[in-house]
């Protein structure tokens, strides 16, 4: 995946605390500043596992990103295996007049360069009978479903656009928005994929389970549509996504299951650098358990099944027919006291490919183990800031490169390879 766009997968921000529930905060008058940051240094004398991933991180960590993983920036978990990242959020709430509340939000990020990822305004109370409905317009992260341990969005519609969120319709909160590509990966003179994203959230089910349902549709729009010599429609067919999420628990003990079906797209309609298979099915199960007050286990299983018919192979410049990705990550955390803790993160990942030429069929697999001794501001699982001193070992076995595009710059060694990284990193949010 291109370096200048891969940073979007790293953004957790305060979503680490919000990934299991979505609720619009009240727009308060005045200025607010908050953010998220992580950074570190790795040292490894072993051959580079994945040159593209190593360049993406640019911090010395010998990143384990399994060959053929098109879904997350790192494999086997993010601890001791990720790039540096910064988000600075600035929010200005205006004085409440006429029972309305208005706000302006900006988000400046830094991965390998500064960028203004979000700039939008929002308003509550525009409709007096539906005062909780929030209208917005601008540039923002939108309709995201986060996964924590492998730091990715299983669903998103980030972009420039407008919409309405959290209209109470009785059964739940209804949201709808229109967005187009935020990161300018396509030629804006030709056009872009435009997504209409909708959701009905916080549907209460028995046994304290909450249900969210999602339905998104995307189509190519722009000057190229009226150009008889353009193949923009062929390369960007209409797409849709249907998904649901089940959640039970709170920030400290929870389980979540997410299932998504995508047609002519992957995890996001507006991230136009992602592959566009004829269909893709994603399933994710994640959770956190406090076994005791000081010992916790976090876990995630991730699955993507992508199928490429002839048209999809043509527009993606690939010879793969099917790709089955499975990833399992387990993080154990033991707090010794208010100042120190130890974490052990293990992960296994596999991608099985079938190709138009059976000789190119194969399974790529690998695993990662990270042991980290931590210094932190408190003993809670979510307490930050934290400094981690870690050692990471990764092993990767590559049987096929059929997933590569004809213009890929990814440098991957066939066969088995391994690498060890020692280093330190910090993580903070405020």
Language-model segments: residues:
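Surface-exposed coil loops of outer-membrane beta-barrel proteins
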Residues: 48-76, 117-120, 127-232, 405-415
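Cleavable N-terminal export/targeting peptides
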Residues: 1-30
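Detector for outer-membrane/organellar transmembrane beta-barrel domains
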Residues: 202-358, 363-371, 375, 420, ...
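C-terminal structured domain segments
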Residues: 360-412
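Transmembrane beta-strands of outer-membrane beta-barrel proteins
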Residues: 34-42, 105-107, 136-140, 175-181, ...
């Amino acid at each position: 995946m291109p370096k200048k766009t891969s940073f979007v997968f790293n953004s957790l921000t305060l979503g680490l605390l919000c990934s299991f529930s979505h609720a619009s905060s009240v727009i308060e008058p005045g200025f607010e500043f908050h953010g998220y940051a992580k950074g570190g240094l790795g040292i490894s004398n072993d051959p580079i596992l994945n040159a593209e991933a190593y360049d993406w991180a640019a911090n010395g960590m010998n990143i384990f990103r399994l060959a053929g993983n098109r879904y997350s920036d790192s494999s086997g978990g993010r601890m001791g295996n990720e790039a540096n990242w910064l988000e600075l959020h600035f929010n200005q709430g205006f004085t409440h007049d006429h029972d309305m509340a208005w706000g302006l939000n900006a988000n400046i990020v830094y991965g390998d360069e500064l960028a203004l990822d979000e700039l939008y305004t929002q308003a509550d109370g525009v409709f007096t009978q539906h005062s909780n409905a929030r209208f917005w317009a601008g540039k923002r992260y939108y309709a995201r479903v986060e996964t924590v341990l492998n730091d990715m969005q299983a669903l998103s519609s980030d972009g420039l656009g407008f919409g309405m969120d959290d209209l109470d319709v009785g059964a739940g909160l209804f949201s709808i928005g229109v967005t187009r590509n935020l990161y300018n990966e396509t030629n804006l003179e030709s056009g872009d994929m435009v997504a209409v994203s909708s959701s009905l959230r916080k549907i209460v089910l028995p046994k304290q389970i909450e249900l969210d349902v999602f339905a998104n549709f995307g189509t190519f729009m722009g000057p190229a549509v009226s150009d008889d010599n353009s193949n923009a429609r062929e390369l960007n067919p209409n797409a849709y996504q249907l998904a649901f999420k089940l959640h039970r628990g709170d920030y400290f003990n929870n389980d979540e299951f997410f299932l998504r079906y995508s047609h002519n797209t992957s995890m996001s309609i507006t991230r136009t650098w992602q592959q566009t298979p004829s269909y893709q099915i994603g399933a994710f199960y994640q959770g956190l358990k406090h076994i005791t007050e000081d010992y916790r286990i976090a876990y995630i299983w991730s699955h993507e099944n992508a199928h490429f018919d002839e048209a999809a192979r043509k527009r993606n410049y690939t010879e793969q027919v099917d790709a089955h990705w499975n990833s399992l990550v387990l993080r154990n955390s033991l707090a010794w006291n208010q100042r120190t803790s130890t974490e052990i993160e293990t992960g296994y990942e596999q991608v099985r490919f079938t190709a138009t030429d059976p000789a190119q069929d194969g399974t790529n697999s690998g695993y990662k183990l990270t042991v980290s001794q931590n210094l932190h501001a408190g003993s809670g699982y979510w307490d930050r800031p934290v400094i981690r001193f870690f050692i990471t070992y990764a092993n990767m076995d590559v049987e096929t490169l059929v997933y590569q595009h004809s213009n890929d710059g990814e440098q991957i060694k066939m066969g088995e390879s391994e690498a060890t990284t020692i280093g330190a990193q910090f993580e903070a949010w405020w």
